[in-house]
């Protein structure tokens, strides 16, 4: 059943401090927009986030595609922008290995993701050990709480993440009510009857385009929110060729928020 509670109501009862913070932020800023900023230079990355920051609750990064990445030059300014504009950070790492390996991938290497990213995500392909490994890395790397999303469904054409795979991934998510805060999915993932309040974040959302020729399939803001999405993830729709990030950021922010108000009966 699609949740119709407000973000504030959900924050008050959520077991995860990360989810609580995110829900409160969304309500305060009146936005459920996550900007997916996939660009190859630190300068463009930070410039886009500066423009989009006022309109988003989250920025989604693929930090490993930035050619000139450095912790001091890329992450430190990103954290400053997050503080300035009051948004959280989601590194779209899609971990998919055994627990011991992902623990090292999350905490170490060049990127040290657990030190700076509020939220990350993982596939369920290797079982529940991946949740345990990532949680241990989070606890050992940062005093700040961290949250994990499981990849239950994908927006790409021909995706294998459906049916039994999705159901098994949901079962893995149930292994840690505090650390696993929700899913990357196309619809509500249930769990309410068992006391879970999962956040659903949905990529492949567009107000104009239907696809990109490389397998991405777009759905409208109203379509995804009506079927259970809490946060809309938008990338090229915000800053693709010929688009003004400030104009599009406001446009998608307003569309997402109005869809949320309709769903909760507030509009």
Swiss-Prot record:
Q: What class of enzyme is it?
A: lyase
Q: What is its EC number?
A: 4.1.1.23
Kindly list the positions annotated as binding substrate: 38, 60-62, 92-101, 218, 236
Q: Which GO terms describe its cellular component?
A: cytosol
One GO MF annotation is:
orotidine-5'-phosphate decarboxylase activity
Query: Gene3D superfamilies of this UniProt entry?
Result: Aldolase class I
Task: For this entry, list what GO says about its biological process.
Answer: 'de novo' pyrimidine nucleobase biosynthetic process; 'de novo' UMP biosynthetic process
Tell me the route in metabolism or biology where this protein functions: Pyrimidine metabolism; UMP biosynthesis via de novo pathway; UMP from orotate: step 2/2
Q: Which UniProt keywords apply?
A: Decarboxylase, Lyase, Pyrimidine biosynthesis
Judging by the UniProt lineage, the source's domain of life is Eukaryota
The record, for InterPro entries, names: Aldolase_TIM, OMPdecase, OMPdecase_AS, OMPdeCOase_dom, RibuloseP-bd_barrel
Q: Could you tell me which Pfam families the record lists for this protein?
A: OMPdecase
**Catalytic residues (UniProt):** 94 (proton donor)
Listed under catalytic activity are: orotidine 5'-phosphate + H(+) = UMP + CO2
Query: To which protein family does this belong?
Result: Belongs to the OMP decarboxylase family.
How is this protein named in the record? Orotidine 5'-phosphate decarboxylase
Which source organism? Debaryomyces hansenii (strain ATCC 36239 / CBS 767 / BCRC 21394 / JCM 1990 / NBRC 0083 / IGC 2968)
Instruction: Please name the gene that encodes this protein.
Output: URA3
């Amino acid at each position: 059943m699609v949740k119709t509670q407000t973000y504030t109501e959900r924050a008050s009862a959520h077991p995860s401090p990360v989810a609580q913070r995110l829900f409160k932020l969304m309500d305060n800023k009146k936005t459920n927009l996550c900007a997916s900023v996939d660009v190859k230079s630190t300068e463009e990355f930070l410039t886009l986030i500066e423009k989009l920051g006022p309109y988003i609750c989250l920025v989604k990064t693929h930090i490993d595609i930035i050619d000139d990445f450095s912790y001091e030059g890329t992450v430190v300014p990103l954290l400053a922008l997050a503080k300035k504009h009051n948004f959280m950070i989601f590194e779209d790492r899609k971990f998919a290995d055994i627990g011991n390996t992902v623990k090292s991938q999350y905490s170490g290497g060049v990127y040290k993701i657990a030190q700076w990213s509020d939220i990350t995500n993982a596939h369920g392909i290797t079982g529940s050990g991946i949740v345990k490994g990532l949680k241990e890395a989070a606890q050992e790397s940062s005093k700040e709480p961290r949250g994990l999303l499981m990849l239950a469904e994908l927006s790409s054409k021909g995706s294998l993440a459906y049916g039994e795979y999705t159901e098994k991934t949901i079962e893995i998510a149930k292994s840690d009510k505090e650390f696993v805060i929700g899913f990357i999915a196309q619809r509500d993932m249930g769990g309410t009857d068992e006391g879970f309040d999962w956040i659903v974040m949905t990529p492949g959302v567009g107000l104009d385009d239907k696809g990109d020729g490389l397998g991405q399939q777009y759905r409208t803001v109203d379509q995804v929110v009506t079927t259970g999405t809490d946060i809309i993830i938008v990338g090229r729709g915000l800053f693709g060729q010929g688009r003004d990030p400030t104009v599009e950021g406001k446009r998608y922010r307003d569309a997402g928020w109005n869809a949320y108000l309709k769903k909760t009966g507030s509009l």
